[in-house]
């Protein structure tokens, strides 16, 4: 009896020692009882299936304990070939049981990610398109090769897209909705704006690329990390089955507190051949405190102003790869027409659009695209911020291909854009392929982007010091002297907001 008791205690000690880490997010806004579980890299499909069967059995056994938790159980399942995991609603004891499985790498509380607060300004001249194709600021024409991203698919992981907007010319399709709100539209306007910059006929860079809308943020611009990871997984699988990940670009104008799960998902997408453009954030602080901007394998983008200075709101630091226009950018809005927004959310789609353009023109893909963007860019940005290793502003100049001709920039009136006047066809470069296949049926998604800056002409605030801990909430990157912080936090983090958005999680 004593021997049996000794063995039992020893096994319990070994189990406890090998238990996966349950990560703490003390400063983050978490979704009640919601967790993300990541399996170890060597987990086979059989191991994963066995774990899921065990989890179902555990839920059945703990049914009385979970009676007070609504909608308990698995919600998303992730399978990136080399990375497997899932998310769900679980009670504390079940989470402890999950962590004891030797195949589990870590368990992470599900946190909220949001779009960055938006800054809208009327009658602002458009300048971003012209800047990336001219050597000096102040130009008013966009010069590009007529291949214009043809054959490349761009995935907008955002608040959704008005796919019927005239600027998309029928090249945009609905893909997936990870928000589970049953609302396949862009109620925020953020996703339509970023998509217009990427592929729009008038406002866009890659004017012949296809667009797939993947909604991971709700109409209020926020959503849990678990849904964003699911959105990334969906994009990778869709690209693999529809033309290949080497002809796919993903834009993520969103961010929040540091998340191992989100960074690992982004890294898996890059490893499997996709190009990811990610907004650095709008807090005027070190971008290493945010995910997915802190993931080294993605292309992390800071924002520049019209005078080639770093935008006053833009994050900085070692995580940044490039800068792109992000202040007072005019692009499409839901329902037709246009509007002006500012933020690193506006800078990232310039990089995503130019990536699609270069992939079609030069036949490059994946991680090579960010390196090529650095080669083509100009060393123009001033006041890059502490520890920032680059002052490169993106440019399409010098890209090999056909003979580019200038095209007029977008209309300066954001409410009533004029009919776009495209240049006469130039000698084409490397032609791309037609859009490969049909999208998967839609489903909901969560996540969020980055907001405003101070008015033009104001001096930029001194950079904020590096936060002592990377564990703060996945929230938008607000910024700007006129930004209503009190109203923002009350709106997005007040109890009533979350009760309405995640009502099923509350008793």
From Swiss-Prot:
Keyword set, alphabetical order: Glycoprotein, Hydrolase, Protease, Secreted, Serine protease, Signal, Virulence, Zymogen
Could you tell me where the Low complexity compositional bias lies? 450-461
PROSITE patterns on file? SUBTILASE, SUBTILASE_SER
**Record's compositionally biased regions (Pro residues):** 405-428, 438-449, 462-476
Q: Propeptide spans which residues?
A: 20-116
Instruction: Name the residue ranges with Polar residues bias.
Output: 282-294, 378-394
Catalytic residues (positions):
158 (charge relay system), 190 (charge relay system), 345 (charge relay system)
InterPro entries, alphabetically?
PCSK9_ProteinaseK-like, Peptidase_S8/S53_dom, Peptidase_S8/S53_dom_sf, Peptidase_S8_Ser-AS, Peptidase_S8_subtilisin-like, Peptidase_S8_subtilisin-rel, S8pro/Inhibitor_I9, S8pro/Inhibitor_I9_sf
Entry-listed glycosylation sites? 251
Molecular function terms in GO for this entry?
serine-type endopeptidase activity
Q: What is the lineage of its organism?
A: Eukaryota, Fungi, Dikarya, Ascomycota, Pezizomycotina
Pfam families attached here? Inhibitor_I9, Peptidase_S8
Q: Where would you find this protein in the cell?
A: Secreted
Q: Where is the signal peptide?
A: 1-19
Outline the segment boundaries, as ranges, of region: Disordered.
175-198, 282-312, 378-486
Q: What does this protein do?
A: Secreted subtilisin-like serine protease with keratinolytic activity that contributes to pathogenicity.
Going by the record, the broad EC class of this enzyme is: hydrolase
Sorted alphabetically, the Gene Ontology BP terms of this entry are: proteolysis
Record-given protein name: Subtilisin-like protease 1
Q: Where is the Peptidase S8 domain?
A: 126-400
UniProt keyword Transit peptide, yes or no? no
């Amino acid at each position: 009896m004593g021997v049996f008791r000794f063995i039992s205690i020893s096994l319990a000690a070994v189990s406890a020692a090998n238990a996966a880490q349950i990560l703490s997010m003390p400063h983050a806004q978490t979704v009640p009882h919601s967790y993300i579980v990541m399996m170890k890299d060597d987990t086979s499909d059989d191991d994963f299936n066995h774990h899921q069967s065990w989890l179902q059995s555990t839920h059945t056994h703990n049914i009385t304990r979970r009676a007070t938790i609504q909608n308990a159980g698995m919600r998303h399942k992730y399978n990136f070939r080399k990375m497997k995991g899932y998310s769900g609603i679980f009670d504390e004891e079940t989470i402890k049981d999950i962590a004891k499985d030797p195949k589990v790498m870590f368990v992470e509380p599900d946190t909220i990610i949001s779009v960055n607060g938006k800054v809208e300004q009327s009658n602002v001249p458009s300048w971003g398109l012209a800047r990336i194709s001219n050597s000096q600021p102040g130009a008013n024409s966009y010069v590009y090769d007529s291949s214009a991203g043809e054959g490349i698919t761009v995935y907008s992981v955002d608040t959704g897209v008005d796919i019927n907007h005239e600027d998309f010319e029928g090249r945009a399709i609905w893909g997936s909705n990870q928000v589970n709100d049953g609302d396949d539209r862009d109620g925020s306007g953020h996703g339509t704006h970023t998509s217009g910059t990427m592929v729009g006929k008038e406002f866009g860079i890659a004017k012949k690329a296809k667009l797939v809308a993947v909604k991971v943020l709700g109409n209020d611009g926020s959503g849990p990390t678990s849904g964003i990871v699911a959105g990334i997984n969906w994009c990778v699988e869709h690209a693999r089955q529809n033309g290949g990940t080497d002809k796919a670009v993903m834009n993520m104008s969103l961010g929040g507190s540091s998340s191992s799960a989100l960074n690992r998902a982004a890294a898996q997408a890059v490893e499997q051949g996709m190009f990811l453009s990610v907004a650095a954030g709008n807090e005027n602080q070190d971008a290493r405190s945010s995910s997915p901007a802190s993931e080294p394998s993605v292309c992390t983008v800071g924002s520049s102003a019209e005078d080639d200075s770093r935008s006053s709101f833009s994050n900085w630091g070692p995580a940044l790869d490039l800068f792109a226009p992000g202040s007072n950018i005019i692009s499409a809005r839901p329902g037709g027409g246009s509007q002006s927004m500012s933020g690193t959310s506006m800078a990232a789609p310039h990089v995503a659009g130019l990536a699609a353009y270069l992939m079609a023109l030069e036949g490059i893909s994946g991680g090579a695209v960010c390196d090529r963007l650095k080669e083509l860019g100009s060393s123009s940005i001033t006041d890059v911020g502490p520890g920032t290793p680059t002052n490169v502003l993106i440019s399409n100049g010098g890209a090999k291909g056909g003979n580019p001709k200038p095209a007029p920039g977008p209309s300066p009136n954001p409410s009533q854009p004029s009919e776009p006047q495209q240049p006469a066809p130039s000698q084409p470069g490397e032609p791309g392929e037609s859009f490969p296949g049909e999208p998967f049926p839609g489903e909901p998604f969560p996540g969020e982007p980055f907001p405003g800056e101070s008015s033009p002409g104001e001096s930029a605030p001194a950079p904020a010091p590096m936060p002592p801990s990377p564990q703060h909430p996945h929230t938008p990157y607000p910024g700007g002297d006129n930004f209503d912080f009190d109203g923002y936090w009350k709106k997005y983090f007040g109890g009533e907001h979350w009760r309405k958005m995640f009502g099923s999680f509350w008793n």
